[in-house]
Amino acid sequence: TGKRVMTSSSSPGISLKSEGISYLAGCDLPALIVNVQRGGPGLGGIQPSQSDYMQATRGAGHGDFHLLVLAPASVQEMVNLTFKGFDLAEKYRMPVMLLSDGTMGQMMEPVSLDMGEITQYDKSWALTGTGLKREPNVVNSLYIKPDELEVLNFKRYEKYAQIKENEQM
C-alpha cells in the first residue's frame, strides 16, 4: 500500500528473516529493519556486541545486495536514526538496517520525538489495487533472463555508489 514498514528482532531472528530481507532488496522495496544484536553464536546474550556487523554491512542474505546500515550511539540517536532510516529506505527504495545491541536495548533516557517534515517519494511500486482504473502493478524479484538480472544488479550497484557519495554521516 506504500505505507512505511518496520520489523525488528535480535541476531538469531534477523538470520531467520534474511531470506525475506533478500527479497525486499531484490524487489527494491523500502523497509526499516531493527537488529538489537546479541553477543556470541546461537542465541547469544544481551551484553554489548558487534557480532552482526559483517552480516549487516555485507548483505544480510544471499545475492548481490547491500543494506544501508545506521548505528546509533544513544537512545536519542536511535530515535533520530529511526526517522532517518524510514526516509532513506523510501528515498533509495531499499531495506535499511538500524543496528543496535543489548546494552542500547536496555537503556532509558528522555528523548525528543520530533519527526520533522516527511518527504513524499514516488511510490509507483506500491500495490494499492487497481480499482479497475489501471493495469495491475507487479513487484518481482525473480529475473530468469541473465541479461535482465545483470542490468538490475548494475543499477543496484550504481545506487550504492550514489548512497556512498551522498549519505556519509
State the predicted function of each range:
Residues 23-26, 57-63, 88-92, 98, ...:
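Solvent-exposed alpha-helices and their adjacent loops that cap or buttress functional pockets
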Residues 34-36, 60-66, 156, 169:
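Gly-rich Lys/Arg/Thr-decorated short loops/hinges at beta-loop-alpha junctions or inter-strand turns
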Residues 41, 54-55, 63, 83, ...:
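Sparse, context-dependent recognition of short Cys/His-centered cofactor- or disulfide-binding micro-motifs
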Residues 93-169:
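Conformationally flexible catalytic loops at phosphate/diphosphate-handling active centers
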